[in-house]
Amino acid sequence: MAKQDYYESLGVAKSADDREIKKAYKRLAMKYHPDRNPGDSEAEAKFKEIKEAYEILIDSQKRAAYDQYGHAAFEQGGMGGGGGGGFGGGGADFGDIFGDVFGDIFGGGRRQRASRGSDLRYNMELSLEEAVRGVTKEIRIPALEECDVCHGNGAKPGSSPITCPTCHGNGQVQMRQGFFTVQQACPHCHGRGKIIKDPCIKCHGHGRVEKSKTLSVKIPAGVDTGDRIRLSGEGEAGDHGAPSGDLYVQVQVKAHPIFQREENNLYCEVPINFAMAALGGEIEVPTLDGRVKLKVPAETQTGKLFRMRGKGVKSVRGGAQGDLLCRVVVETPVNLNERQRQLLQELDESFGGPSGERNSPRSKNFFDGVKKFFDDLTR
């Protein structure tokens, strides 16, 4: 079976310089490397093909021989003197190539820095009143805190971490894997470049200890479910003196027995009897600041909304305060005595029945529509 042209294998022109060849090889090697394609025989074969092509074309002597003789230059006896066949010596510096390309795959590349502490989350449940007015609450959270004996460096007081003798402070070591060399985090110091010979007796060299701490959290007025408050530096302590993480307080507002909130407006339902709805009058309605009087005009229908401006929620981000919207619900009277029943019957008769035109225009329109509907069906 004929071999693929080396230039075609790398997808470069025959005039490509070393920089273009190296760039093409890095891109293809990353794509087809066996560690990224486990169990894929086609990817493995492609990887071997591009590796062979790269080894020939990056070496000026081998490239010149290939340009003149093609693949025959590297077949058994096909080239004298300095050729060498297959994957023979010289050519690519795989330690250099794969140190760049596969550093992340094999865990190497750079010295590992002490990691920042983890962020923490605390779920805080508030009443509607607390959310609207704002409140200060104390919370207690478990967290990893900086050790107060070694002050986070993990070493026994009076001593200090020493340079790792395995990686000599680099935090990484070179490992030979097949035809190339890769860099990995030093297994002795775990990539830090230093080791603790005399660990702190309290934190055992970790630089952090488990503690519970109490914090005072100020909740601003106007917060709502889903809002998040960030307390910088109040998360877990960082690794060996690295910065601490943050604490995020997640707000959840409990359901209220009277009010419902939509953005900065409050809604409530206010029941009124049918006499009040028909004749009008004045009622007391609740607000978060106490009761206020509301005038109900005569002939008010159930479901009508009354807006009380400025009685809603103050925006946590500034701006105008929301409103309170009261929806009146006309109640049907129950538990009637004989006198009340008699009066209602007299009232009904005075209306002229359920479809009385003057007193119940919507009822008349409804019954007129029903009559027309059935008339149309019988035509």
From Swiss-Prot:
User: Could you tell me what this protein does?
Assistant: Participates actively in the response to hyperosmotic and heat shock by preventing the aggregation of stress-denatured proteins and by disaggregating proteins, also in an autonomous, DnaK-independent fashion. Unfolded proteins bind initially to DnaJ; upon interaction with the DnaJ-bound protein, DnaK hydrolyzes its bound ATP, resulting in the formation of a stable complex. GrpE releases ADP from DnaK; ATP binding to DnaK triggers the release of the substrate protein, thus completing the reaction cycle.
Q: What is this protein called?
A: Chaperone protein DnaJ
For this UniProt record, give its keywords in alphabetical order, as a comma-separated list: Chaperone, Cytoplasm, DNA replication, Metal-binding, Repeat, Stress response, Zinc, Zinc-finger
- Cross-referenced NCBIfam families, in alphabetical order? DnaJ_bact, PRK10767.1
Q: Which SMART domains match?
A: DnaJ
Task: List ligand-binding residues for Zn(2+) 2.
Answer: C164, C167, C186, C189
Q: What domain of life?
A: Bacteria
Give the domain note: The J domain is necessary and sufficient to stimulate DnaK ATPase activity. Zinc center 1 plays an important role in the autonomous, DnaK-independent chaperone activity of DnaJ. Zinc center 2 is essential for interaction with DnaK and for DnaJ activity.
Q: Where are the zinc fingers (CR-type)?
A: 134-212
Q: Just give the chief location class.
A: cytoplasm
Q: Which cysteines are joined by disulfide bonds?
A: none
Q: Which Pfam families match?
A: DnaJ, DnaJ_C, DnaJ_CXXCXGXG
What is the annotated localization of this protein? Cytoplasm
Q: Does the keyword Zinc apply?
A: yes
Q: Where is the signal peptide?
A: none
Where does it sit, as one GO cellular component term? cytoplasm
Sites where the protein binds Zn(2+) 1: C147, C150, C200, C203
Reply yes or no: does the keyword Metal-binding apply.
Answer: yes
Q: Which residues form the J domain?
A: 5-70
